[in-house]
Amino acid sequence: KETMLECKNYFDQFKKDNIKNFQLKTGIFQSPVITNCRFECLDMTFRGTRIKASNSSPLIIPCIVRNKEGKRFKYEMMYKKDDLRQEKIIMDIIQLMDIILKREEKLDLSITTYNILPINNKEGFIEMISSSKTLYQLQKESFTIQNFINENNPDTTVREWKTRFVNSCVAHCIISYLLGIGDRHLENMMITNKG
C-alpha cells in the first residue's frame, strides 16, 4: 500500500502539471489489482497514460510488470478519484459467488472479475481487463457481439463460445438482480474477446 500511496502522489502531480514524459521506477510491490500474485513493477510511464472520457476523468496507466516466473507483460490500471469502497465490496461478493459455484456446484459460468483497491474514501485503483471492450465501443465500431467473439476465437467452435457467452450473461443478470446493481448501460457493460 505504501508504494501505491507514493504512486498516487505522482498521479496527482501528473494531473496537476500535465507531465508528458515522466517515468517512475519502483521496486517489488504486492499488486493491488491482481489477487494472490506478486509482481515486480519494472516501469510505470505516463507516455501512454490517457484520461478516460467520463465524469470522474480517471487515468489509465500503462505498466510493465514481471511475474514470479520472470515473464514480462503489459498491464493497465485505472486511477480514479471516487469512493470505490462499495464497488470493492460488491466485486469481492461476486468473486466469492464464483468460487462457491465452481467449488461446491462444479459450475463454471465464465464470470470475469477484476480487483479494486480503494486508497481512501476519495480515490483508488481498478484493474483493467485486457482484451475487452464496452458494448458501446462495439456498437460504435459497427461490430455485432457475434462477429466480435467469432473473429477473436477462430480455434473455438461456435457452440463453445456461445455457451460461454450465454453462461456469463445469465450469471451477470442474476448477480446484478441479487445485489441490486442498477445503472446498466452500454458504456459500463463489457465483453472480453473470449465472450
Map each language-model feature to its residues:
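Charged, compositionally biased non-catalytic regions
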Residues: 1-34
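Conserved ATP-binding subdomain of kinase catalytic cores across diverse folds
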Residues: 21-181, 193-195
